[in-house]
Design a protein with these regions (language model features):
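Bacterial N-terminal signal peptides that target proteins for export
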Residues: 1-11
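His/Asp/Glu-enriched, well-ordered alpha-helical/loop segment
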Residues: 103-104, 109-115, 121, 253, ...
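Polyanionic/metal-chelating signatures
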Residues: 134, 139-278, 406, 412, ...
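Sec/Tat signal peptide C-region and signal peptidase I cleavage site
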Residues: 18-24
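Histidine-rich, glycine-flanked metal-binding segment
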Residues: 29-31, 35, 44, 48-88
């Protein structure tokens, strides 16, 4: 039997040899930043403080220490030449299922939906698979932070802010409970006739009024629970109600999924009655209630810029021009890749389409960086390039919103990220096959 010392020697040899053979196939998790780094001569797009030409960014221990022009570089700092390159904040997907959804057709690889209508105690981060293939492809597209979001029911649970680098969900989680998610009922659902799998007729779904009343009752019960605890009363612990306290205390927003104008209007009325902060997610008809959204300073997370029109009479470019129209109307908004981890890596193209259809590029960049960070409560750490924030950024050949630009390197909290992903691996693998074949036949 192999003794312990021999086993350790084998493990050490494997640790040295295996990465050499697999690093092209598997993205490697890198250790925390170990030395100060200065990138000089790049064009730095801070998002909040303009563009710095021929600038320098210095970071240490995962934090930006200084940013500007002609900075003094401390002794011992590793200097990187950024001449001709651009530096942008890491992109942020405000609505994703990255890490909790892998293959749509394989149920056991999806951990998005919980049973029941009210699950505010559910947090996405505890279910995150840090080895998800979608993490690498998302980072290659420039997305370095994502809000992984549970679904199902009326109250789905908490979105978790994830930094897309780490060995485990604990290492990746920036904010475990960043926002509560509510799926606003649809007043005009499609009705289907048929029979259930057991041969009996399907039960009719609850009416719109019944669902809204159920939601209001749950919030009333949770508020009473919070008030009873605050008054020092002895109450039986309920994890669902306990999770709601941060909402009533104004510490986190409620993200309300609503697309239709009637849905959005009713959701806004409800939020005003509850005196809670909300963000509309979806917002397909947001432009039709723009005045009310502006009046109450309610932002929107658009979930699909690259979408077909939802109604026969709408123009083909209705979704494409929505960001530009909301911007003109004064509505604050972010752009997301849309539901599903598969779509997080198309986030820059969603914003790029908005630019092609009238949205100023600087506003599109804000929609996938600082706006998303502000709406979801992490703007003190990410979303722009400023001293004191995390060193989470991209080094590119041009704007990340343009498909012709290359993202040459990413840093997450100062870590120099392995840029390999599964799509690049298969591209290189089968290009090698083609080249080998050509050498044989030529």
């Amino acid at each position: 039997m192999m003794n312990f010392k021999h086993a350790m020697k084998v493990a050490v040899v494997a640790a040295v040899v295996v990465p050499a053979t697999l690093d092209a196939q598997v993205r490697m998790t890198v250790p925390p930043q170990a030395e100060a780094v200065a990138i000089q001569g790049a064009t730095i797009h801070t998002v909040t403080n303009g563009v710095i030409e021929n600038g320098t960014i210095i970071f240490n221990d995962g934090i930006i220490t200084s940013i500007g022009v002609n900075l003094d570089v401390p002794a011992g700092t590793r200097v990187v030449d950024g001449d001709g390159k651009h530096i942008y904040p890491g992109l942020i997907d405000a609505y994703s299922t990255v890490g909790i959804s892998e293959i749509g057709a394989v149920d056991v690889s999806n951990d998005v939906n919980e049973l029941g209508d009210f699950n505010p105690n559910v947090r996405a981060d505890v279910a995150v698979n840090a080895e998800s293939r979608h993490i690498g492809t998302s980072r290659s597209a420039g997305v370095l932070v994502a809000f992984s979001t549970p679904g199902g029911g009326l109250v789905s649970g908490m979105s978790s802010a994830l930094s897309l680098e780490g060995w485990s969900w604990e290492e990746m989680s920036m904010e475990s409970a960043a926002a509560l998610n509510v799926n606003w009922p649809n007043p005009n659902p499609r009705r289907f006739r048929g029979f259930g799998g057991r041969g009996g007729p399907q039960e009719p779904p609850p009416s719109y009024e019944e669902q809204v009343q159920s939601l209001k009752s749950f919030f009333a019960e949770a508020r009473a629970y919070r008030d009873a605890i605050a008054a020092g009363e002895e109450v039986r612990t309920d994890s669902r109600y306990a999770a709601m306290v941060s909402v009533f205390d104004g510490k986190i927003p409620v993200v309300v999924a609503a697309d239709g104008a009637a849905q959005i209007n009713d959701a806004v009325t409800w939020a005003l009655e509850e005196d809670i902060e909300i963000v509309i997610r979806g917002g397909g008809d947001a432009i039709h209630v723009a005045d009310r959204l502006v009046a109450h300073d309610i932002p929107v997370i658009l979930t699909s810029t690259m979408a077909a029109p939802g109604r026969d009479y709408e123009g083909y470019d209705g979704a494409y021009t929505m960001p530009a129209r909301l911007h003109e109307a004064g509505v604050r908004f972010a752009i997301s890749g849309g539901a599903g981890s598969l779509y997080t890596n198309r986030l820059p193209w969603e914003a790029g389409v908005a630019v092609a259809f009238g949205l100023p590029e600087e506003e599109a960049l804000k929609a996938v960086t600082i706006n998303a960070a502000e709406f979801m409560g992490v703007a003190d750490r990410v979303g722009s390039l400023e001293a004191g924030k995390q060193a989470t950024f991209l080094i590119t050949t041009g704007t990340p919103l343009d498909m012709t630009s290359d993202i040459e390197q990413s840093y997450i909290q100062g870590r120099e990220i392995d840029m390999m992903d599964i799509q690049k691996f298969f591209f290189e693998k089968y290009m090698t096959k083609v080249m080998q074949y050509l050498r044989v036949v030529m």
